[in-house]
């Protein structure tokens, strides 16, 4: 069972910056940021201002029977899990195959059990770990004495996988299918990429989060993959026997009932 130790947070933003700097040295880390100090969300939808987990006690990755493996892993460990479920999991659940080139080469699913979990709520920091109070005090002091991230200009030029002409031609075809009733809605996406770039993903997340102030921001590092998310939407939240989804589309009230 994890121990929990509590510390007072003097400057929330500086703490987040220092945690991002500290987390650079670990292959496994995850920051979940609600930006609740900026945007007032209903308390029932936001339990913490931020959660930061890092270092790995154990981890699991899979490309076959992933849901069953994750279920068994969680059943065995019964602890915090941080990670991702990829889009290509659909190919495991249904007789489907992705035709688009995968330039990231990520697993269908990957999760880790962190050695340390930092829970920031109100003005208090709760640290969960199997370590002693003495060890955690040293760790806390090391983090507090970190330098903050430097806010500097980051210039990235992206390329599109499709030309403007091809993109507009596909949009024309999609509109035709909508007009004749084959479909009523579609999300059409294309990749924007840069294969030759050197940038600190921690600094990039910190800067973008300052701009977007998203209620469901996250920064995940698993092995050699970094994922930055600055989303206004939550896919799913499970709380005891209740499941909540918070999408943007289709949620506005249209009448009194």
Regions found by a protein language model. Give the residues of each.
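Extended alpha-helical targeting/anchoring segments
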Residues: 1-257
């Amino acid at each position: 069972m994890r121990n929990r130790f509590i510390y007072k947070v003097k400057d929330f933003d500086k703490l987040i910056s220092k945690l991002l700097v500290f987390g650079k040295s670990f292959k496994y880390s995850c920051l979940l940021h609600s930006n609740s100090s900026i945007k007032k969300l209903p308390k029932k939808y936001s339990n913490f201002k931020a959660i930061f987990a890092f270092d790995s006690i154990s981890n699991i990755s899979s490309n076959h029977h992933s849901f069953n493996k994750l279920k068994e892993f969680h059943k065995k460990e019964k602890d915090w899990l941080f990670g991702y479920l990829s889009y290509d999991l659909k190919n495991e659940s249904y007789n489907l195959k992705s035709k688009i080139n995968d330039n990231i080469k990520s697993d269908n699913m990957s999760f880790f059990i962190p050695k340390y979990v930092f829970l920031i709520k109100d003005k208090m920091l709760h640290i969960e770990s199997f370590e002693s109070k003495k060890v955690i005090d040293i760790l806390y002091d090391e983090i507090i004495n970190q330098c903050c991230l430097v806010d500097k200009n980051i210039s990235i030029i992206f390329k599109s996988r499709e030309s403007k002409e091809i993109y507009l031609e596909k949009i024309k075809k999609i509109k035709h299918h909508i007009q004749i009733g084959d479909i009523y809605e579609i999300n059409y996406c294309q990749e924007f990429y840069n294969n030759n770039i050197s940038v600190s993903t921690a600094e990039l997340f910190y800067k973008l989060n300052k701009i977007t102030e998203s209620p469901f921001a996250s920064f995940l590092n698993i092995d050699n993959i970094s994922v930055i998310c600055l989303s206004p939407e939550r896919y799913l939240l499970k709380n005891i026997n209740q499941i909540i989804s918070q999408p943007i589309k289709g949620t506005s009230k249209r009448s009194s009932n």
